[in-house]
């Protein structure tokens, strides 16, 4: 029964990120939580927190609906924390994230900095912690720190072959804002490939919209470079003709002098 319940919880999470919100909610609501063991209760709250968080992303720009699902995710996380062993990696990650959601940025940064100092970049928690630290840096206006932590998070995602990611997408957007179109274009292409492979429709519209903007600017930049290259080629061709003409003229003058 516990294996079946775990499967249904994970299925609900996957359904939510794939856009099947009603199916995900029905799956969760059909699960009988009475008699759950401590471990299964922890899995339940972790799954519902993740599911509500994914659902909230669909309502970005619609404050009332976003706040509803976001608050449900935060509430599920508060229920999750007491079920986790204190001091464990999962506990510290969720504690730091909860501090962040409650806008206690200093406490969140303290917990998460301690966490990434003791775990390896190959640990999936490392990427999540670094992404939150990047968001904290962004709230403080520290762009360099934000880029640094987004890069660490993206590298960790790549090492773990994690396809459902946000760090490389955000990093691409940030580099675009700073005028680094080539790297922004490359990173967003990787991000869209990951989105397609993971079937994470919640990320699809965000990444596609950003990629279209960068693609447009990138194409314009490439067109400018091509025009400049044509101008240089024409200029060099004219210089070559002038050089040939000058050599011919000098030879003619030398023959006349001789």
Positions of the model-derived regions?
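A "functional boundary" signal
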Residues: 1-223
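Alpha-helical transmembrane signal-anchor helices
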Residues: 218-258
